[in-house]
Every structure is written in structure tokens, then in C-alpha cells.
């Protein structure tokens, strides 16, 4: 897991973000992007019980809404009424 996948990560631009707990800058990928001991999985479609059959690009199916539809694993789901953490 990476900082980018943490609930405490605040995206700033295409290269870096901010940890809401430590207030420190963290890179999206590469050196220093590994998750810390305070890691909590972010509410993303890929972390939901209703997300299934992702392909190699992270495109899968959401089965939690009235009508099944495609969804990206990295899509934010904090406001989704059907989100259920795995």
C-alpha cells in the first residue's frame, strides 16, 4: 500500500500530497510513497465489497447500486450510499 491509498492522504498535485496526521509532504509514487503505520484504507471503489471483476487497468463492475455499472478501482467512494468496506 502507498500513502496515496490512505484515508489520511490529501492530494495536492500530480506528484505529491499531504498526510493529514503528520502534516508532512508525501510523494504519490517512488521513494517515500510506502504507507506508514497509521495507514487506513481510503474509501475507494476498489476497497468496496460491491466492486468485482477488475481488469488489469482497474476497471471493474459495481454491483451495489440499482443498476450494475462499470467503475474504476481508484474512484473515490466516500459519498457513495452503497459503499461497504472489505
Swiss-Prot record:
Protein name as it appears in the record? 4-hydroxyphenylacetate decarboxylase small subunit
Q: What positions does the entry give for [4Fe-4S] cluster 1 binding?
A: 3, 6, 19, 36
Subunit structure, as described in the record: Heterooctamer consisting of 4 large (HpdB) subunits and 4 small (HpdC) subunits, arranged as a tetramer of heterodimers.
Query: What keywords does the record list, in alphabetical order?
Result: 4Fe-4S, Iron, Iron-sulfur, Lyase, Metal-binding
How does the cofactor attach, per the note?
Binds 2 [4Fe-4S] clusters per subunit.
What's the family? Belongs to the HPA decarboxylase small subunit family.
According to the UniProt entry, what is the EC number of this protein? Answer: 4.1.1.83
| Origin species | Clostridium scatologenes
What does the record give as cofactor? [4Fe-4S] cluster
Q: Would the keyword tRNA processing turn up in this protein's UniProt record?
A: no
| UniProt keyword Metal-binding present | yes
Cite the binding residues for [4Fe-4S] cluster 2: 45, 48, 62, 80
Q: Which domain of life is it from?
A: Bacteria
Q: What Gene Ontology terms describe what this protein does at the molecular function level?
A: 4 iron, 4 sulfur cluster binding; 4-hydroxyphenylacetate decarboxylase activity; metal ion binding
Q: Which reaction does it catalyse?
A: 4-hydroxyphenylacetate + H(+) = 4-methylphenol + CO2; 3,4-dihydroxyphenylacetate + H(+) = 4-methylcatechol + CO2
Job description of the protein = Component of the HPA decarboxylase that decarboxylates phenylacetates with a hydroxyl group in the p-position. Active toward 4-hydroxyphenylacetate and 3,4-dihydroxyphenylacetate, forming 4-methylphenol and 4-methylcatechol, respectively. Is likely involved in the catabolism of aromatic amino acids such as tyrosine fermentation. 4-methylphenol (p-cresol) formation provides metabolic toxicity, which allows an active suppression of other microbes and may provide growth advantages for the producers in highly competitive environments.
